[in-house]
């Protein structure tokens, strides 16, 4: 979406991952992968707005939710049944009973199902009711006021806090603003909470920090974490990277001295951050506006990049330290620089001194 914007590959991948009905097991047997598939459809819809594809895939979304709803326990929480894998991340978290991070994903799926149902002219009220019930239960059982954070498990009695559920609580806007500030202080900015060691979940954490305006911290993390792999000779980004691990053990994984994937697609998220938050491309597709550009030029000494705008075209940004040049090859763009808003017209160039 922020590099090649190939809607066709996106659609074929979505369909291939889901497979045919009836659904008899989770995608890759992983509970959260099924939920992420649903969220992926929503992400595709945001980027391309393809109603025809949405109508094609909607029945599979409904049946996947029905499959998940059949795997709930007494409080309405989604749990792993026999041969299900509750994964979330390669991390030491308390997975006794229902896992909080999983419920955050599950709640986000109810909201997505409601929104997409309504977009297609269908009744989404049942999904909204399920969302309200689930989020109320999450607050009741998983929020720990003393710790100012969500705990992994309420059944074990350990009150263990990891980053994952708390990141999802902010990312999916499940926690209110007051709780989000507590999470920022007590979890995300707390070095006593174990750091994330996969590029995969670093994506979610950095996305949250970007949304909270912490761009300097995110840029520092990109330079230190992904840059740390480059310093060790990486030419592609890895499945997992823990800077504290000795160099001679960096390729260890799955009990194999060379078991780690050194070219893993889930590690490509700097492309997303740099394009969305630093170059500032936001695909909105509403009220006659296709995209908005809010470039954060204070983070660049110079810049020259071409970004895709859905399937509609591209936009080029060139910056020499004084003059920003924007060349639009897509309809319906707006350049926002502080309070100033400048219309971007396909085939025309805008030059602004900053």
Per-range role (PLM):
Residues 22-25, 85-97, 152-155, 186-193, ...:
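Short beta-alpha connecting loops at secondary-structure transitions
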Residues 1-6, 37-53, 104-122, 167-177, ...:
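Well-ordered alpha-helical scaffold segments within catalytic/enzyme domains
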């Amino acid at each position: 979406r922020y590099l090649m914007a190939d809607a066709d590959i996106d659609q074929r991948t979505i369909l291939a991952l889901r497979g045919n009905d009836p659904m008899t097991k989770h995608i890759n047997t992983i509970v959260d992968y099924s939920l992420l598939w649903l969220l992926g459809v929503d992400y595709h819809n945001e980027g391309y707005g393809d109603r025809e594809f949405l109508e094609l895939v909607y029945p599979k979304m409904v049946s996947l939710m029905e499959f998940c709803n059949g795997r709930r326990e007494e409080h309405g929480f989604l749990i792993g049944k026999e041969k299900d894998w509750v994964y979330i991340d390669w991390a030491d978290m308390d997975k006794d009973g229902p896992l909080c991070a999983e419920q955050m994903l599950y709640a986000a799926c109810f909201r997505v199902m409601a929104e997409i149902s309504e977009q297609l002219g269908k009744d989404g009220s049942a999904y909204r009711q399920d969302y309200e019930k689930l989020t109320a239960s999450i607050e009741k059982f998983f929020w720990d006021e003393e710790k100012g954070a969500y705990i992994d498990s309420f059944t074990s009695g350990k009150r263990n806090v990891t980053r994952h559920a708390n990141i999802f609580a902010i990312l999916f806007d499940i926690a209110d603003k007051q709780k989000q500030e507590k999470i920022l202080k007590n979890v995300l900015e707390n070095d006593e909470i174990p750091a994330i060691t996969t590029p995969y979940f670093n994506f979610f954490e950095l996305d949250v920090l970007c949304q909270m305006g912490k761009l300097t911290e995110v840029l520092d993390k990109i330079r230190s974490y992904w840059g740390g792999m480059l310093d060790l000779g990486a030419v592609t980004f890895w499945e997992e990277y823990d800077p504290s691990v000795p160099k001679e053990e960096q390729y260890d994984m799955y009990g194999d001295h060379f078991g780690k994937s050194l070219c893993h697609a889930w590690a490509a998220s700097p492309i997303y951050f740099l394009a969305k938050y630093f170059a500032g491309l936001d695909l909105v597709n509403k009220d006659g506006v296709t995209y908005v550009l809010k470039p954060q030029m204070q983070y660049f000494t110079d810049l020259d990049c071409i970004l895709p705008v859905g399937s509609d075209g591209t936009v080029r940004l060139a910056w020499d330290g004084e003059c920003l040049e924007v060349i639009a090859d897509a309809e319906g763009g707006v350049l926002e620089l502080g309070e100033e808003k400048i219309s971007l017209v396909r085939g025309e160039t805008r030059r602004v001194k900053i």
